[in-house]
Amino acid sequence: MTNHFIGIGKYIPTEKISNLFFEEHQFFNEQGEILDQNNATISYKLKQITGIEERRYARKDQVTSDLGYMAAASAITNANIDAETIDYIIFAHNFGDVKHDTIQSDMVPSLAARVKNLLKIQNPYCVAYDVIFGCPGWVEGVIQANAFIKAGLAKRCLVIGAETLSRVVDEHDRDTMIYADGAGAAILEASTNNKGIQAHLSASYANEEKDYLFFGKSYNSEKCPNTKYIKMYGRKIYEFALSKVPLAMKKCVDDSSYNIDDISKIVIHQANEKMDEAIVKRFYSLYDQDVPKNIMPMNIHKLGNSSVATIPILLKMIMDNDLENHQINEGDVVLFASVGAGMNINTFIYQF
């Protein structure tokens, strides 16, 4: 038995934030020293490395669960189902609901419970819980939903990924420019024709890797040292991803009934354009092949990195034909992959 998506939804915030927005920021390095480059140069270099030209921020009156609800409602409409038939709501995020101009995470009750309430689902046996798994959280939620259905514990699962990273960034850290807000969701149920998830793999590396992404104080020493913001060691993450993710993708393919030539698209977490390109290039090199043309759709240029939300948003955009030169047709085999805080990696193969 395989399980497939019957509905996919997204919510992309309306507020566009271009790189020009950051030109008045004062950036510091890790030692608390003002960067000697002007902000125009910093923005240019960021675009060259990450590909990001602009990103989206949630409205001031919105929080993560609001974004997740919008994506969930979109997925339910797309699936044309009664929300009361959903057995599980799995909400992937990392920071909870964070109100505008605060940096306090609110995770109780769970964001999944909040979405269930907003959807007005009355069925008490619709179980709602959250997943905190770094950027791969939505993919891990899909893998968990797949397991529930295979085990006979559920027939239909809603998996949401949403984040408001703009609320947890240090405005004096240039990495702030990478992060964005957004939400995506999908509904999974058993397939009658063996379409859907064909194989999957997850891994966690929690030795020194666990500290590659963390909460730390502002680079501006005048800021309150007790207030923490999202921080990362970008070079270490890049090296980790390049060494581990291609191997995980290969193992997933090799453990399936497919081979490398069957893969028609790779839908990868939109973390960093150069890193994603390097991962895919190394993946194909493991098979002594060059990267096929138009194999990897990207939307990071206009939407930035919204963590758990990037993959479901990207998938919905492809399915809606919103990306030039990227379509998914019936029978296509797509490889999904993500990497993030933990450090966690996951991947799955899906036949449409």
Regions found by a protein language model. Give the residues of each.
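Condensing-enzyme catalytic core mediating Claisen C-C bond formation in acyl metabolism
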Residues: 1-61, 173-243, 247, 339, ...
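Conserved beta-ketoacyl condensing-enzyme motif
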Residues: 5, 61-132, 258-277
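Conserved catalytic cysteine-centered active-site region
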Residues: 39-63, 98-156, 282-313
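Short, well-ordered amphipathic alpha-helical segments that serve as non-catalytic structural scaffolds
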Residues: 41-42, 65-79, 111-112, 240-256, ...
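Flexible, glycine-rich active-site loops centered on histidine and acidic residues
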Residues: 150-183
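A contiguous, well-structured pocket-lining segment that forms one wall/lid of small-molecule binding clefts
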Residues: 226-300
